């Protein structure tokens, strides 16, 4: 029960902070009233899904080193949850900054860039903090992996819709994200358990995509040549990581299958 209360308090705090932030933007930019209504409904729906998922799987909140059950949401997991719950706000900020450029102008792009940069930056802290403090939980690993691909997948689609990224780059990123989800699904079915693991190249690919999306959101004129260069470098690294993920799948299947199937 203490864990459920901790989850509820954490999500309620994030909900209020994000709602207040959007309300400030809503009033400052004089947006249509239906935007606030839609954002509120989307937030409530999204948060309800997260809450029920966490409560239903509360038994996964255990320390992977000691096996001890968690009685509250630790700091690393709170950081991960913050990253996940930022999704609706990021999507709405992207929509507003592109759909109402005459109202948001330069300010909207700056806010959007800062929001993306701060959200993606949390990915560098939660896992590291969990390892240093020896607070790694099984649920934390699942959330960390899911947050990256959920955020990047939906944000990439939003960026493509508003022509913030090129079609070829969109395809490269989506193929990489889809392949990772497919690999996790296959290994989970074969191994009868979710193993949210990643490779070094996988981590690099995710970091590169995050940095690239921040640059694409900023679209600073003086940096445009460098952004084009970054797009090419990102596509190359993502392509290499796709091959790496296929190799990872092959190894995972080989270790999961009986010895008779290895030959």
Named regions from a protein language model:
Residues 1-73, 77, 91, 113, ...:
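A feature for the membrane-embedded catalytic helix bundles of lipid/isoprenoid biosynthetic enzymes
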Residues 134, 142-146:
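Short hydrophobic alpha-helical segments within the ABC transporter permease transmembrane module
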Residues 127-135:
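Membrane-interface helix/loop boundary segments of multi-pass membrane proteins
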Residues 83, 123, 144, 204:
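Residue-level signature of catalytic and energy-coupling elements of molecular machines
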Residues 68-115:
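Hydrophobic alpha-helical segments and helix pairs
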Residues 86, 126, 147-151:
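Short active-site segment of divalent metal-dependent hydrolases/proteases
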Residues 104-111, 140, 223-226:
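Membrane-interface starts of transmembrane alpha-helices
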Residues 116-120, 124-128, 141:
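Membrane-cytosol interface at the C-terminal ends of specific transmembrane alpha-helices
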């Amino acid at each position: 029960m203490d864990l459920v209360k901790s989850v509820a308090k954490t999500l309620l705090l994030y909900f209020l902070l994000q709602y207040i932030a959007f309300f400030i933007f809503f009033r400052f930019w004089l947006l249509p009233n239906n935007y606030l209504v839609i954002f509120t409904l989307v937030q409530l729906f999204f948060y309800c899904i997260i809450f029920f998922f966490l409560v239903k799987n509360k038994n996964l909140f255990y320390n992977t080193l000691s096996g001890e059950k968690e009685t509250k949401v630790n700091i690393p997991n709170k950081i991960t949850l913050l990253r996940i719950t930022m999704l609706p706000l990021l999507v709405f900020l992207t929509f507003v900054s592109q759909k109402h450029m005459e109202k948001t102008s330069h300010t909207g792009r700056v806010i959007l860039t800062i929001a993306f940069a701060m959200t993606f930056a949390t990915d560098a802290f939660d896992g590291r903090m969990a390892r240093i403090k020896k607070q790694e939980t099984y649920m934390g690993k699942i959330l960390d992996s899911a947050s990256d691909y959920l955020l990047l997948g939906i944000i990439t689609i939003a960026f493509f819709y508003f022509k913030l990224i090129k079609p070829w780059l969109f395809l490269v990123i989506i193929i990489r994200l889809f392949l990772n989800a497919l690999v996790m699904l296959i290994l989970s079915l074969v191994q009868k358990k979710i193993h949210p693991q990643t490779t070094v190249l996988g981590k690099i690919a995710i970091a590169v995509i995050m940095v690239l999306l921040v640059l694409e959101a900023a679209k600073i004129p003086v940096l445009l040549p460098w952004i084009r260069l970054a797009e090419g470098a990102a596509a190359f690294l993502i392509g290499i990581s796709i091959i790496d993920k296929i190799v990872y799948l092959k190894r995972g299947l080989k270790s999961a299958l009986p010895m008779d199937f290895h030959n």
